[in-house]
Swiss-Prot record:
This is Glycerol-3-phosphate dehydrogenase [NAD(P)+]. GO terms for cellular component: cytosol. Belongs to the NAD-dependent glycerol-3-phosphate dehydrogenase family. The lineage of its organism: Bacteria, Pseudomonadati, Pseudomonadota, Gammaproteobacteria, Legionellales. It is found in: Cytoplasm. Pathway: Membrane lipid metabolism; glycerophospholipid metabolism. The active site is at 192 (proton acceptor). The gene is gpsA.
Amino acid sequence: MEPFKHPIAILGAGSWGTALALVLARKGQKVRLWSYESDHVDEMQAEGVNNRYLPNYPFPETLKAYCDLKASLEGVTDILIVVPSFAFHEVITRMKPLIDAKTRIAWGTKGLAKGSRLLHEVVATELGQVPMAVISGPSLATEVAANLPTAVSLASNNSQFSKDLIERLHGQRFRVYKNDDMIGVELCGSVKNILAIATGISDGLKLGSNARAALITRGLTEMGRLVSVFGGKQETLTGLAGLGDLVLTCTDNQSRNRRFGLALGEGVDKKEAQQSIGQAIEGLYNTDQVHALAQKHAIEMPLTFQVHRILHEDLDPQQAVQELLERSPKAE
């Protein structure tokens, strides 16, 4: 493929944003990787690698780090946002006066914005019905950077943008599958991090493999209830953005959310566990957002509710498990 005429801007230089930047730059595309932290950008520019969040993977010549948001967006049509969900709205607001009508917005952020809003709703409110896309699926940043085989889902509201973005990203080692269910993909990405905390807690308490499998399976049911209420497709649940990402995040210790849950299950204080991770723990923030959404729409999500009580009401993890085990039996 010939490199695209215009550079692509990636807003967010954490591990996942950097991994996606590497995928694009290795295909010869010009990539501008933006971070709001000037000292971090200085390091990346001097060292040619993101030693803070994704060390050992040198930047190709076409990948440049930026701190000036305006400069990073100049002459750019396609923007890929990869910041924590709690910062998503702020980034959209900051870039709003710097873009034009031709801009197309994609994101690799997984979660809900403040007020339990889906991210495409935030984009539509601030920017109108621009071409949008969300990328999600089982994709550990270190494995993507190491060029290990990975498959993700890309859902969009615009067929041309979907086609172009898949062409930008897709390769033998990074396979991108088209999807038209933005709602389902976004909600799956929000809930799976909460369930990863739950399975981490279970494993930290040494409850065994049977319990882990049960949590993943019943968690998928909770995910399905939420997706159904908001008009998402049930097929998304068994795809890469649903079951695929859920299994990976709940079982691999590279998952920050799982490691956070493990620490809580082992009796580590919440604040100490959070500090030990070193990067954003999406499930910690999104438990509150998903919990509020479930309460508002009367959706039964017992695992999510117990994780919320552990994180925000100081419920002891052992007690949370006991209460789940004491629930009345129901039809599967």
